[in-house]
Amino acid sequence: MDSNTITSFQVDCYLWHIRKLLSMRDMCDAPFDDRLRRDQKALKGRGSTLGLDLRVATMEGKKIVEDILKSETDENLKIAIASSPAPRYITDMSIEEISREWYMLMPRQKITGGLMVKMDQAIMDKRITLKANFSVLFDQLETLVSLRAFTDHGAIVAEISPIPSMPGHSTEDVKNAIGILIGGLEWNDNSIRASENIQRFAWGIRDENGGPPLPPKQKRYMARRVESEV
């Protein structure tokens, strides 16, 4: 096993512990808590994959961070902060919407690019809106936290979420996953609209009508992929 992989995991565990302490002291906001829960699942998945104990990894991570801080100067910290752009957190969904349990009558699942696409194929002839929570860097979607599809009545009928035990995903991975989800839902004559944030930061476009953020050619390609799988 690569030593850098182990070191990275140990440091991530310790930094998560620090963030958890902030949360316990009510010193953070809702997006912070949202990321904390997501990262906890990811760390458990990575720990299982690497065969490492989280508690031991956290202690080792503490030693690594303390050694780095001993040699870190305030001037170096200022330079690092000035040169590193900070990601923004975009929230289409409330905490209730992103954490609500939902069920599928005719479940369909597909893994693509470190993302899990789930949809209920029993849903037909509905108007569906896609909402997502994600981080943005350089005015482009960086990391997807969760994307869910809602009917006009607020029922959840589909979801895209990162797989904790797998490495990160790219913007293209998210686009492909959304394409698969849209194609699968449109196959059953549902009409899909995406939030303005999804259109803007995933595809860099604005559609005032809220239509699916896919060009017709790509939509047909994705629909054929879903059709062949169904």
From Swiss-Prot:
Region: CPSF4-binding, residue numbers: 180-215
Domain note: The dsRNA-binding region is required for suppression of RNA silencing.
State the family named in the UniProt similarity comment for this chain: Belongs to the influenza A viruses NS1 family.
The entry's comment on post-translational modification says:
Upon interferon induction, ISGylated via host HERC5; this results in the impairment of NS1 interaction with RNA targets due to its inability to form homodimers and to interact with host EIF2AK2/PKR.
Q: Name one GO biological process term.
A: symbiont-mediated suppression of host type I interferon-mediated signaling pathway
Keywords for this entry?
Eukaryotic host gene expression shutoff by virus, Host cytoplasm, Host gene expression shutoff by virus, Host mRNA suppression by virus, Host nucleus, Host-virus interaction, Inhibition of host innate immune response by virus, Inhibition of host interferon signaling pathway by virus, Inhibition of host PKR by virus, Inhibition of host pre-mRNA processing by virus, Inhibition of host RIG-I by virus, Inhibition of host RLR pathway by virus, Interferon antiviral system evasion, RNA-binding, Ubl conjugation, Viral immunoevasion
Residues spanned by motif Nuclear localization signal:
34-38
Task: Kindly list the GO CC terms recorded for this protein.
Answer: host cell cytoplasm; host cell nucleus
Q: Which gene encodes it?
A: NS
* Region of interest (Disordered), residue spans: 209-230
Q: List the disulfide bonds.
A: none
The record ties this protein, via HAMAP family, to: INFV_NS1 (MF_04066)
Location in or out of the cell? Host nucleus; Host cytoplasm
Subunit composition? Homodimer. Interacts with host TRIM25 (via coiled coil); this interaction specifically inhibits TRIM25 multimerization and TRIM25-mediated RIGI CARD ubiquitination. Interacts with human EIF2AK2/PKR, CPSF4, IVNS1ABP and PABPN1.
InterPro entries given in the database record = NS1 (IPR004208), NS1A (IPR000256), NS1A_effect_dom-like_sf (IPR038064), uS15_NS1_RNA-bd_sf (IPR009068)
Q: Which organism is it from?
A: Influenza A virus (strain A/Pintail/Alberta/358/1979 H3N6)
What is this protein's record name?
Non-structural protein 1
The segments labelled RNA-binding and homodimerization in the record are 1-73
One of the entry's Gene Ontology molecular-function terms is: RNA binding
Q: What is its main location?
A: host cell
